[in-house]
Structures are given as structure tokens and as C-alpha cells.
Swiss-Prot record:
Pfam family, one: TMP-TENI
Species, as recorded: Saccharophagus degradans (strain 2-40 / ATCC 43961 / DSM 17024)
The protein's name in its UniProt record: Thiamine-phosphate synthase
InterPro entries from the UniProt entry: Aldolase_TIM, ThiamineP_synth_sf, ThiamineP_synth_TenI, TMP_synthase
Residues reported in the UniProt entry to bind Mg(2+): 72, 91
Residues annotated for 4-amino-2-methyl-5-(diphosphooxymethyl)pyrimidine binding in this entry: 39-43, 71, 110, 140
Cofactor(s) needed: Mg(2+)
Biological-process GO terms, alphabetical: thiamine biosynthetic process; thiamine diphosphate biosynthetic process
Gene Ontology CC entries for this record: cytoplasm
Entry keyword set: Magnesium, Metal-binding, Thiamine biosynthesis, Transferase
Job description of the protein: Condenses 4-methyl-5-(beta-hydroxyethyl)thiazole monophosphate (THZ-P) and 2-methyl-4-amino-5-hydroxymethyl pyrimidine pyrophosphate (HMP-PP) to form thiamine monophosphate (TMP).
Amino acid sequence: MPHNKHTVYAITDATLMPTTASLCHRVELALRSGVTWLQYRDKSSNTSKRSEQAQALKALCQTYNAKLIINDDTALAKQVGADGVHLGQTDGCIVSARELLGPQAIIGSTCHASLELAERALAQGSSYVAFGRFFASNTKPNAAPAQLSLLAHAQQKFTCPIVAIGGITPSNGAQLLHAGATTLAVCHSLFADDNVEYRAKCLLGLTPNAEDALVTS
């Protein structure tokens, strides 16, 4: 994730895109608009479906020169040749994921609102740390809130990419960039809207020194 310009990190949602066709269609719209990081997130137990979809997304990401990260499944990331895996606090061991995926793999860690969790994750080999939720979230409505000041502290403390997640829209994303986030992770705001391309471009066009984009959330 580059530090000179923020990254939009798109996260899929199996409820919003229940079929492989709908998933690939909306993801391709986002990638075509300039999104370069994608996380495949499907918590279902349907392993054949998840394998099929992950392989399809890997092909799309290769076409658009984007990174594919698998949520919570190191084995699936290895199987499809994904660029890495994202692990929650109860999703698996960072050290084991690094051993399986290799030194070049991207490993992300959910750290909620805790600098201590982030410090521990980085010590274990995480590539980036994710904080949030910062706003009301449709994907995880019961997640504990995080304060904007957390991002400034993280930016001062860590040199890795700082990912903000939770309720991010084109109308509030600039606040997070100004506070210290390098990466905006978005799910519902991007993929629940019919005009995925427009939403992606609005998110990509945010700047930390500008007023929030004047678009509806």
C-alpha cells in the first residue's frame, strides 16, 4: 500500500453479492475504476463456492493489477495464490500464516481500537494493521467504536500502512485520511450502491486536506 497516496481497500460482502456472477461484476467495476486492493470475505462454510469465487477474483485482480487478500482463511489464500490474508483477533496465527504463505505475503491484522494489539501484530509479522469501526457500520453494527485520535497515535508509532474501517463513505473518508489513515477499507458503501464506479472514484478522489466529498452517503 503506497504512502504517498491513500489506498481504497474494497471488501466483498456475500449478502450484497450472493452469486459468483454478481460478485465478479461488482468487483470488476471497482477495479476498473482504480481500486487496487481487494479483500474476499465470505464467512460461509461452502468451501467449493468460496474456492470458485476466490479463483475468479484472483483472475480479475491479475487482469487489473490489483492485490487479492483473503479474509480469515490462510489455506484458501495459499490454494488460489492470493497476495495475502487478513486475520481477525480470533481468526488464526500471524506467525503460522507467514510460515505458510512466505515472506512476500501480505498479512493484515484487525486491531479494533488498540495500539497494543497493533504492536503485537507487527511484532509477529503483520504487514499492516486495521483499526475501527470509526462510524456506524452496516457490515458489523455491533463492533466497538474507535476514536479518530487513534489514527494519529498509530501514524506516529508505526511505519506500516494504517487501515481505517467501519462505516466509511465518500462523505466521511477525508476525516480519516486527515487523522492519519493511509488506507480506507470499504464494503457496504461501495458495493451496496448500484453505481459502484462512481462511488469508487469518489473514495479514490478524497484528500486529507480537502473538505469531505459533497456526495450522498
